[in-house]
């Protein structure tokens, strides 16, 4: 049998990290078993579902590279199929119409609560004969009264729920819209899903859905219910912890490889290994190795992974992601070095691509002012001679290379009988406007001869004005 998994988000908000991790686990289980991965949009909550949220989910999945083999399917386009199955269930007696008013249901629950009983539907309409009436009704699934539901969860082991703990689930509301728990069952059946990977908040739904599957004569998939992600304070991850949509991580400068690597380790491990490529994960990942304990989100660990991938991935690939940030920060990359050169030069220092983009601006744009603190420290009167001499030697340099630039810096220091720092730091501030950059010879090379000379001349004027003021 072909392994077939699915990710089935509701488009009522962005794709958050918990959902992304669930999608990743489901995707990996399919890929590890040469199976198929289905994307399904569960949009039966018509009032809360939005196209914007749906687009955000698709964008997030695409950015992460979690490609799907089927879909996206939309539940709102399958209402005819759900209604067809409901009619069959009514005919077979595995579902029934319930005419109980909202007031009666509320009164029933209040009585049950007062008696310390479990609050569930009492089956008032369960055995009523069909009647011709205009009264509003819902349709309920006739849940078995005896026995229990037993299933072996990949994460939590054997789970058993007595049927007398389950009530007769509403599968179609008074407005004619089929309910989530029912649509999920029909979809998983029709789509041939063999393993359902989802959050632990769905555990209570599972026995209900299994009973409906049994009533339909449908195969029962395997299940894996993964634990929630916590904030560093032990509470459920939420916006106050900085929990955001997946695309916000893109906007903040993270590579998809870093986020995927981080998410897979939030609950799954393979020895002490921390770094995993997607190809490795396709071989190593097993649902049974997922830890059932909740995992805490650690932003510092994510940053560490991001730094690793910025430094270790192909600069051409990193540059393709960096371009988005350059555009976002309105840096025109046509007026300067190739982005791959920037990645190679700056990757050792950068924590995020957003930071890398911001720190590379001086390679593409001239600046109006020098950093005040750096200028005060390094663009003093003593800097005038090394700046002037270097600029003179620079004009005589025909072969513009890192090695030759380095030789000119050394020659300037030697001729003036000063340390390299006495030449290097004024030059660095002169050409970058600040005090940090890659190696000075590489920095000058990437900025270019003409632009470097212009900036050094500007610094010479700045120092001269400072001396004369």
UniProtKB/Swiss-Prot annotation:
One Gene Ontology cellular component annotation held by this UniProt entry: cytosol
Pfam families: Anticodon_2 (PF19269), tRNA-synt_1c (PF00749)
InterPro entries to which the protein is assigned, alphabetical: aa-tRNA-synth_I_cd-bd, aa-tRNA-synth_I_codon-bd_sub2, aa-tRNA-synth_I_CS, aa_tRNA-synth_I_cd-bd_sf, Glu-tRNA-ligase_bac/mito, Glu/Gln-tRNA-synth, Glu/Gln-tRNA-synth_Ib_cat-dom, GluQ/Sye
GO MF annotation, one: ATP binding
Catalytic activity reported: tRNA(Glu) + L-glutamate + ATP = L-glutamyl-tRNA(Glu) + AMP + diphosphate
Cellular location(s): Cytoplasm
Motif 'HIGH' region, chain ranges: 9-19
UniProt superkingdom: Bacteria
Principal place of residence: cytoplasm
Keyword ATP-binding carried by entry: yes
UniProt-listed GO biological process terms: glutamyl-tRNA aminoacylation
Keywords, ordered alphabetically: Aminoacyl-tRNA synthetase, ATP-binding, Cytoplasm, Ligase, Nucleotide-binding, Protein biosynthesis
Residues engaged in binding ATP: 239
Entry's EC annotation: 6.1.1.17
The keyword Membrane is annotated on this UniProt entry: no
Family: Belongs to the class-I aminoacyl-tRNA synthetase family. Glutamate--tRNA ligase type 1 subfamily.
Role description: Catalyzes the attachment of glutamate to tRNA(Glu) in a two-step reaction: glutamate is first activated by ATP to form Glu-AMP and then transferred to the acceptor end of tRNA(Glu).
Name of the featured protein: Glutamate--tRNA ligase
Organism: Shewanella frigidimarina (strain NCIMB 400)
Gene: gltX
């Amino acid at each position: 049998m072909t392994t077939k998994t699915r990710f089935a988000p509701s488009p009522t908000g962005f794709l958050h990290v918990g959902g992304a991790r669930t999608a990743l686990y489901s995707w990996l289980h399919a890929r590890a078993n040469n199976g198929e991965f289905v994307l399904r949009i569960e949009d039966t909550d018509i009032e809360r579902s939005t196209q914007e949220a749906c687009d955000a989910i698709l964008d997030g999945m695409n950015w992460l590279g979690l490609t799907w083999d089927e879909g996206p399917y939309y539940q709102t386009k399958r209402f005819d199929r759900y209604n067809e199955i409901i009619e069959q269930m009514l005919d077979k007696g595995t579902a029934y119409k319930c005419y109980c008013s909202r007031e009666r249901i509320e009164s029933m629950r209040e009585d049950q609560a007062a008696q310390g009983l479990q609050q569930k539907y009492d089956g008032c309409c369960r055995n009523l004969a069909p009647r011709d009436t205009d009264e509003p009704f819902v349709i309920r699934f006739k849940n078995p009264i005896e026995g229990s539901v037993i299933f072996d969860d990949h994460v939590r082991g054997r789970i058993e729920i007595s049927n007398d703990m389950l009530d007769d689930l509403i599968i179609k509301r008074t407005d004619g819209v089929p309910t989530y728990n029912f649509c999920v069952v029909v979809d998983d059946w029709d789509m041939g899903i063999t393993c359902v990977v989802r959050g632990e908040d769905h555990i209570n739904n599972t026995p209900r859905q299994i009973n409906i599957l049994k009533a339909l004569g449908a195969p029962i998939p395997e299940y894996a219910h993964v634990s929630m992600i916590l904030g560093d304070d032990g509470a459920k991850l939420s916006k106050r912890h900085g929990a955001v949509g997946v695309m916000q991580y893109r906007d903040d400068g993270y590579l998809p490889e870093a986020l995927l690597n981080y998410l897979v380790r939030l609950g799954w491990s393979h020895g002490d290994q921390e770094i995993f490529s997607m190809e490795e994960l396709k071989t190593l990942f097993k649902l049974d190795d997922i830890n059932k304990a909740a995992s805490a989100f650690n932003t510092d660990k994510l940053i560490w992974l991001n730094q690793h991938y910025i430094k270790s991935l192909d600069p051409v690939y990193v540059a393709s992601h960096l371009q988005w940030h350059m555009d976002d920060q309105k840096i025109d990359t046509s007026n300067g070095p190739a982005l791959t050169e920037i990645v190679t030069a700056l990757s050792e220092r950068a924590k995020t691509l957003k930071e890398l983009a911001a720190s590379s601006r001086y390679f593409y744009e001239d600046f109006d002012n020098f950093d005040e603190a750096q200028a005060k420290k390094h663009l003093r009167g003593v800097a005038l001679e090394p700046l002037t001499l270097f600029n003179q030697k620079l004009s005589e340099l025909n072969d513009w290379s890192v090695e030759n630039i380095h030789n000119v810096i050394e020659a300037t220091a030697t001729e003036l009988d000063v340390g390299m720092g006495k030449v290097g730091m004024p030059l660095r501030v002169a050409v970058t406007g600040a005090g940090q950059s890659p190696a000075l010879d590489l920095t000058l090379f990437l900025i270019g001869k003409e632009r470097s000379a212009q900036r050094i001349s500007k610094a010479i004027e700045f120092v001269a004005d400072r001396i004369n003021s």
